[in-house]
Amino acid sequence: MENENKPNVANFEAAVAVKDYEKACSELLLILSQLDSNFGGIQEIEFEYPVQLQDLEQEKIVYFCTRMATAITTLFSDPVLEISDLGVQRFLVYQRWLALIFASSPFVNADHILQTYNREPNRKNSLEIHLDSSKSSLIKFCILYLPESNVNLNLDVMWNISPELCASLCFALQSPRFIGTSTAFNKRATILQWFPRHLDQLKNLNNIPSAISHDVYMHCSYDTSVNKHDVKRALNHVIRRHIESEYGWKDRYVAHIGYRNNKPVMVVLLEHFHSAHSIYRTHSTSMIAAREHFYLIGLGSPSVDQAGQEVFDEFHLVAGDNMKQKLEFIRSVCESNGAAIFYMPSIGMDMTTIFASNTRLAPIQAIALGHPATTHSDFIEYVIVEDDYVGSEACFSETLLRLPKDALPYVPSALAPEKVDYLLRENPEVVNIGIASTTMKLNPYFLEALKAIRDRAKVKVHFHFALGQSNGITHPYVERFIKSYLGDSATAHPHSPYHQYLRILHNCDMMVNPFPFGNTNGIIDMVTLGLVGVCKTGAEVHEHIDEGLFKRLGLPEWLIANTVDEYVERAVRLAENHQERLELRRYIIENNGLNTLFTGDPRPMGQVFLEKLNAFLKEN
């Protein structure tokens, strides 16, 4: 009995075979839900595989994906299959895992299934699918129109037929954590230009997969267009209308300022905030220092550990079984304490912060750049940022509170090695180039640049991708993408524990940083290992942060590129000139540049918030 509700591939296949489609869909959703919980891993999903694959993890994953894709093909090719309005929402929340099942199998996409929906035998273009007029066909089309699809889609036509279904598909297509291939990347880029003005027409979130709203909000940052964050403004408007109409939301009356221990109150809403997470390492010191002027109340999830909780004068778990209850809890804390400041060190990784950013909870509301981008919210006045991380203020809807560059000193990672045996190779036959990157930061432009580096360098190079989030069924797809540009000149290492990840980079001679979304922790890891590399700067903070860090570390400015051509040229120079590269590495090692990131004066944030509060009180 205990295995009955466990995800099981054979159970799914059996239900498909006997055309018990209700059971088949339930079994499929169970498998997709488990993949979601596992971040793509296939553990806890029961399926038999040939014993020959026992120790071949990647081949086992491809085998799993191929079996799943074959059964899904049979299921969705049958015209008898009907998916309800509720069913399509459930499938679209998990569409990214359907996409990976096909992308990591030989099928690549589900276009062969979409072709069975075509009702126009005399079409001129096989990539044009002419559906019948039933809603059922449109629903099935939306579920299987995946990021890798080559089929033509007219969003205007779909919007005219069903705005909510079209919006739901746009949500799903922006939700994957890897949108790196030119097909997938261009699809998202098109949506980011088309979608904002249409999304803004929706009255509420009721008939769209709002559970993946934070993916829409956050993943737009990995695009390359200047207006890529506009989708946030539209999403914010829909969220605001939703909480007013569906929750009966009323903003807090913020004229009353309360005091605890004779200090005004700052309420801090947290996302990922524990001692092993980068947000804790980058933003805890400034909050501790702010307690000189404010009584700090932290609000977060059970993942906030003891170290995270101790940053605050008091800490509360956010109570509530749903978003309405969570928002009401946050408002009650702000109300009962007369919060003067409502502050979020990061926003975009969790639904609660995004919803809260569309409410008025305190007279002064601010974020920091734990996820480095604007909110486009009508309710956030300020962004806390170190001065040297700013590229262009025009990237923000908020007013920037620009702090000195040492005002947010980092806390060293608890996992950082105590001692490093530096690997300094004098004249390597092959220059190993390390790339620390999550899957979200990979894109065709970055890979084209790496290909140009390989082709132009007079020395042989090999790229080692130390990948974050490339787990389970994600990895074969990511690896194929990397190999499609770099072939045997690259090794794609799947997501690995921190020490193993450092070992991959330790064996490299230099590094290059991804763009347009650069690195913070990757640069810290680079310098920890006595490595140097090249970065590309730009207008957005998530581009410019690399430049700021390189300059703080005392690296020469020629390693900071303004254009892709400069990036390629400088990476080639660093790869070819062994002596110059080793001198730079020795400089970094001997001067312990990393120490500059861990030292500084964390007091300015609290001071500038106090100034803003005093100005507010004077005016009111």
Curated annotation (Swiss-Prot):
GO cellular component terms, semicolon-separated: cytoplasm
EC number from the UniProt entry: 2.4.1.-
Group of enzyme by EC: transferase
Pathway recorded for this protein: Protein modification; protein glycosylation
Annotated keywords: Cytoplasm, Glycosyltransferase, Transferase
Keyword set includes Transferase: yes
Gene Ontology biological-process annotations: protein N-linked glycosylation via asparagine
Reaction catalyzed: L-asparaginyl-[protein] + UDP-alpha-D-glucose = N(4)-(beta-D-glucosyl)-L-asparaginyl-[protein] + UDP + H(+)
GO MF entries: UDP-glucosyltransferase activity
Cofactor descriptive note: Does not require a metal cofactor.
Chief subcellular location: cytoplasm
Compartments where located: Cytoplasm
InterPro entries, alphabetized: Glycosyltr_41/O-GlcNAc_trsf, HMW1_D2, HMW1C_N
Family: Belongs to the glycosyltransferase 41 family.
Role: Inverting glycosyltransferase that catalyzes the transfer of one glucose moiety from UDP-glucose to an asparagine residue in peptides and proteins containing the NX(S/T) motif, resulting in their modification with a beta-linked 1,N-glucose. Likely acts as a key component of a general protein glycosylation system. Also accepts UDP-galactose as a substrate donor, albeit with low efficiency. Cannot use UDP-GlcNAc or UDP-GalNAc as substrate donor.
PANTHER family: PROTEIN O-GLCNAC TRANSFERASE, UDP-N-ACETYLGLUCOSAMINE--PEPTIDE N-ACETYLGLUCOSAMINYLTRANSFERASE SPINDLY-RELATED
Protein name: UDP-glucose:protein N-beta-glucosyltransferase
